[in-house]
Structures are given as structure tokens and as C-alpha cells.
Amino acid sequence: MSKSESPKEPEQLRKLFIGGLSFETTDESLRSHFEQWGTLTDCVVMRDPNTKRSRGFGFVTYATVEEVDAAMNARPHKVDGRVVEPKRAVSREDSQRPGAHLTVKKIFVGGIKEDTEEHHLRDYFEQYGKIEVIEIMTDRGSGKKRGFAFVTFDDHDSVDKIVIQKYHTVNGHNCEVRKALCKQEMASASSSQRGRSGSGNFGGGRGGGFGGNDNFGRGGNFSGRGGFGGSRGGGGYGGSGDGYNGFGNDGSNFGGGGSYNDFGNYNNQSSNFGPMKGGNFGGRSSGPYGGGGQYFAKPRNQGGYGGSSSSSSYGSGRRF
């Protein structure tokens, strides 16, 4: 990366995915539009490596996060006569999480301490946008706080901006933040990722994006077989309406080895958060789902993502 392309802020935070492009849109016309809001250090329309035909999405990278914010605040955008959908680009690592491409206005905040009040959450998260609702979850029987909360914003971009940040400190303690998905959204994440053909905002670089032929496979990756939002329990935050612990009603969805990505021992509230009954995370091409924070582990044989490979799918072109 050249000096001019390495400002203080990480590149991932300065990058936008642009979906819904006209097939007539070129790198030049995309650049011409988005450089109205700042200096672009990179701009590319993703194309099929064989036919060179546009895949209908691209990426623009600004010199500063401030310019990204300006572009997002200028929505809606129309490029070559077509309204396009800009979103904060999702990193390679984050793109493996179910629902990473979904547009939501609510976040899950885990690992918060018992003395954390609503004002602590508001004071921290209002820097990202207008907050509509804050819910600190408590045990229905004892009234004791359960160590997590939900925050709802008025704009999905606030959520997108928050989740690409790796570290958040609320009330003096580090916490973990994820998009909050309802049952239907989890099911959508399970089914839609099987053949997205590159329409998602997964893409860290010039090459792959998330698209391709059958990515995320039909062999159990996030679908059926006890995956996140799988078949038996349907997934969802708070299966029976009482918070975060009801991920699959039978423990099959979102199982793990005792914690949600190692940031909170939510399983002590419910057996539903325990080991999976459904086998492996990611079917045949990755390791076990749970245990020691493996839930978000990168699949082995990962290929295509963000590179120049023609397969553009996870698993080095393997099809399930």
C-alpha cells in the first residue's frame, strides 16, 4: 500500500460496499459519483473474471472515515440513473458470521457488568446515531441483570458502523457487540447465504466479494443440521421471549463450549446454550462449532474471498 493510501484509520473502516449497480456502471462513473464526498483511494466495479461482465456491485474506499460518513449521510445515491445501496464493507473475518449481510437497526451488547445502567449505554452508543430503545435484559424471576442488552437505532448504518469496530468500552468495561437478529432473520441468514451470487456486502478487496456459485454450501454451513438459525429450533434471540438464551430451543443452534465467542458465560442461565447436537459448524470444511470460541473460526480451505480467484466462494471452490 502506498503512503498516500495508508492514513491513520484502518482501510476496512474507510471502505463502502456499493450494491445494486447498473451493469453499465464503470469504475470511472462510480468514482465520479462518490468522489463528491471525499478523496477516493480505491474504486472498483466487481466483474466476472471470464466474461468481464459487471456483477452488479463494487467497492469505494475513502481517505478518511469522516468522508465515508459524509457519503452515507448523503443517501440515497443514484449512479448512472439507478438508485444504489451503499453499506459499510464487511471484513473477511466478519463476513463468516450469520446475518453479516442483513440490514438491521438493533444490536446485541454482551458482557456488560451488573452495575451498568441505561445511561451508560446511551452515553457510549449515541455517538453512532440516534437511539430509539435501550433494553437491559433481566431475569424474569429474580430481576437480576443477565449481562447483556439490546440497543435499537433509527438507521441501519449506525449498526453497521458499530459492528465493524472491534472494541467497545461501556461503563469502563470491554463488551462485545453483534447485530441482533430475530428468528426470521436468522432463518434468512441460513437460507440466503447458500447462493447469493455476489450480492452481499462481503468483500475486503478487489477480487471476490462474497459471491460465486453456491457459497456457504448446502452441506450444513449455517443451514439445517443445527446451524445458526437451523431447522429444529429456528434460532432467534430469546426463543420463548425471555432474552438471549433460547437460541434453538433444543440447543442445536448456536451451541458452543460454554460461552458466546468467549465474551460472556450466558450458558449458566440455560441449557439451551450448551454443546451442539447438530454436528460441526460449517459442515465438511471447517472445525467444530463450539468450544473455546471456535464459533467464529475461519473455515479451512478458505479461498476466493477478496482475492482474484474466479471461484469467489469459500472452500477454494468446493461445492457442497
From Swiss-Prot:
Sites of Asymmetric dimethylarginine modification: 194, 206, 218, 225, 232
Sites of the Glycyl lysine isopeptide (Lys-Gly) (interchain with G-Cter in SUMO2) crosslink: 3, 8, 78, 179, 183, 298
GO biological process: alternative mRNA splicing, via spliceosome; cellular response to epidermal growth factor stimulus; cellular response to glucose starvation; cellular response to potassium ion; cellular response to sodium arsenite; import into nucleus; lung development; male gonad development
Bias kind Gly residues: ranges: 197-216, 276-294
N-acetylmethionine modification, residue list: 1
Any one GO cellular component localisation term in the record: nucleoplasmic periphery of the nuclear pore complex
UniProt keyword annotations, A-Z: Acetylation, Cytoplasm, Isopeptide bond, Methylation, mRNA processing, mRNA splicing, mRNA transport, Nucleus, Phosphoprotein, Repeat, Ribonucleoprotein, RNA-binding, Spliceosome, Transport, Ubl conjugation
Chain positions covered by the region annotation Nuclear targeting sequence: 268-305
RRM domain span: 14-97, 105-184
Biased composition annotated in UniProt, kind: Low complexity: 308-320
Compartment(s): Nucleus; Cytoplasm
Region (Globular A domain): 4-94
N-acetylserine: residues carrying this PTM: 2
GO molecular function: DNA binding; DNA/DNA annealing activity; G-rich strand telomeric DNA binding; miRNA binding; mRNA 3'-UTR binding; mRNA binding; pre-mRNA binding; protein domain specific binding
Modified residues (Omega-N-methylarginine): 194, 206, 218, 225, 232, 284, 300, 318
Cross-referenced Pfam families: HnRNPA1_LC, RRM_1
Stretch list, region RNA-binding RGG-box: 218-240
InterPro entries with a match to the protein in the record: HnRNPA1/A2_C, hnRNPA1_RRM1, Nucleotide-bd_a/b_plait_sf, RBD_domain_sf, RRM_dom
Its biological purpose: Involved in the packaging of pre-mRNA into hnRNP particles, transport of poly(A) mRNA from the nucleus to the cytoplasm and modulation of splice site selection. Plays a role in the splicing of pyruvate kinase PKM by binding repressively to sequences flanking PKM exon 9, inhibiting exon 9 inclusion and resulting in exon 10 inclusion and production of the PKM M2 isoform. Binds to the IRES and thereby inhibits the translation of the apoptosis protease activating factor APAF1. May bind to specific miRNA hairpins.
Subunit architecture: Identified in the spliceosome C complex. Identified in a IGF2BP1-dependent mRNP granule complex containing untranslated mRNAs. Interacts with SEPT6. Interacts with C9orf72. Interacts with KHDRBS1. Interacts with UBQLN2. Interacts with PPIA/CYPA.
Name this protein carries in UniProt: Heterogeneous nuclear ribonucleoprotein A1
